Curated annotation (Swiss-Prot):
Residues the entry annotates as binding [4Fe-4S] cluster 2: C156, C160, C163
Cofactors that this protein relies on: [4Fe-4S] cluster
Protein name: tRNA-2-methylthio-N(6)-dimethylallyladenosine synthase
Native species: Cupriavidus pinatubonensis (strain JMP 134 / LMG 1197)
GO cellular component: cytosol
Length: 450
């Protein structure tokens, strides 16, 4: 049986796309996924261009594949994702042994690209932006576990000054309303209990409602997803403060299936820096969203993205960012030092802050966030958490593990419970009393209801 190996870089959108690459090749050619690159007949790199030196990391990986290709001449090597969109045919120029180059919107064409490569002997490049076409050509998802991602839109139209995403993934395009609901319903029928709705700016969703001129916004989509039998939890990422409507805020007051956690990237807490970033909101507007959410859910868990060392960032600007972090009490974050991306407006900004200063700021920010994370975990001891059981514990297969609404892994034992009964609990929602907090997980005991 032929096998495909996929290495994924970057965001959850890329993770979703990688799963779809496997689904497409399985449905068309019977390829099965493998974790061993040396066993693969097809090797795909799903790339990300958000961080610095992304291109060089890709070519470094490709260089290691050259020897493997020499031993296995029929091996197919492909490069997809955002670096593929940026570099296109130049990837083949630098690495002639690459067989196919494809963008995020053309992954569904992989079987045809591979077939043309094998037929013609010529490397194939397709980095076009066909609007939403790929979703019409994807096979049904192969479910693994009780949680699943569902992409509801593609691209970004915000054009933040530092970001390459609009150039690599295209403008915002929403999937039709009924298509999203049909995919979620299909997943629920296969045992999925938790869906994560995905988009570059997921709350900018504007989906056409079949046969009418009406458009469904993100809040309406969530309401309908919540009505699908079997779906018990709804997450989404990534949201944009500029698109966080009052309708979406109000939904947290009446939709229990929306988890009590939100990832809402702020990037910075200086209005001057936010303006230079072209984010489209002020710090006050951002804090207003959190204030209104916590009026409805006082213990709402928050996470965010932060960029440290944006050109012109002063000590006073950074102090404002740290003040916001302390005020909100973020529970995890994705934080980075600014790296200029070629072709973006911010790449041309004057930057006179020494790298050592930026690094020191980042370390201070990350240490503060980590203190918040540990404090929140310790405060969960003694509470009863509703968790979705995902499967056996990684360290002890006789135990089970699941996740809380704020994404904590919880391990728990079931002494005296037969294996068959434990297996039936996978995919179920259970109450667990938290007894211990560790740096990266929690431990608890299942609560038996009388």
């Amino acid at each position: 049986m032929k096998k495909v190996f996929v290495k994924t870089y970057g965001c959850q959108m890329n993770e979703y796309d990688s799963d779809k690459m496997v689904d497409v090749l399985n449905a068309s050619q019977g390829l099965e996924p493998t974790d061993n690159v040396e066993d693969a007949d097809v090797i795909l790199f799903n790339t990300c261009s958000v961080r610095e030196k992304a291109q060089e990391k890709v070519f470094s990986e490709l260089g290691r594949m050259k020897a493997l290709k020499a031993v296995k001449p029929d091996l197919v090597i492909g490069v997809g994702g955002c670096v593929a969109s940026q570099e296109g045919a130049s990837i083949v120029s630098r690495a002639p042994y690459v067989d196919v180059v494809f963008g995020p919107q053309t992954l569904h064409r992989l079987p045809d690209l591979i077939a043309r490569r094998q037929r013609t002997g010529q490397s194939q490049v397709d980095i076009s932006f066909p609007e939403i076409e790929k979703f019409d050509h994807l096979p049904p998802a192969r479910v693994e576990g009780p949680s699943a991602f569902v992409s509801i839109m593609e691209g970004c139209s915000k054009y933040c000054s530092y970001c390459v995403v609009p150039y690599t993934r295209g403008e915002e395009v929403s999937r039709p309303f009924e298509d999203v609901l049909a995919e979620v319903a299909g997943l629920a029928e296969q045992g999925v209990r938790e869906v994560t709705l995905l988009g570059q700016n997921v709350n900018a969703y504007r989906g056409a409602m079949g046969g009418t001129s009406e458009i469904a916004d993100f809040a309406l989509l969530i309401e309908y997803v919540a009505e699908i039998p079997g779906i018990e939890r709804i997450r989404y990422t990534t949201s944009h403060p500029k698109e966080f409507t009052s309708r979406l805020v109000e939904l947290y007051g009446r939709c229990d299936k929306l988890v009590n956690h939100l990832h809402l990237p702020v990037q910075h807490a200086s209005d001057r820096v936010l303006m230079a970033m072209k984010r489209g909101y002020s710090v006050l507007e951002y804090k207003s969203i959190i204030r209104r959410l916590r009026m409805l859910r006082p213990d709402m868990s928050m996470s965010s993205d932060f960029i440290v060392g944006f050109p012109g960032e002063t000590d006073a600007d950074f102090d404002k960012l740290m003040a916001l972090i302390e005020e909100v009490g973020y529970d995890t974050s994705f934080s980075f030092i600014f790296s200029p991306r070629p072709g973006t407006p911010a790449a041309n900004l004057h930057d006179d802050t020494p790298h050592e200063v930026k690094l020191r700021r980042l370390q201070h920010l990350q240490a503060t966030i980590e203190e918040n994370v540990q404090r929140i975990s310790r405060n969960m001891v003694g509470s009863v958490q509703r968790i979705l059981v995902e499967g056996p514990s990684r360290k002890d297969p006789t135990e089970l593990h699941g996740r809380t609404e704020n994404n904590r892994v919880v391990n728990f034992a079931l002494p005296g419970v037969p294996q068959a009964q434990r297996d039936r609990m996978i995919g179920q929602m259970v109450d667990v009393s938290i007894t211990q907090a560790f740096p990266h997980s929690l431990r608890g005991e299942i609560v038996v209801r009388q």
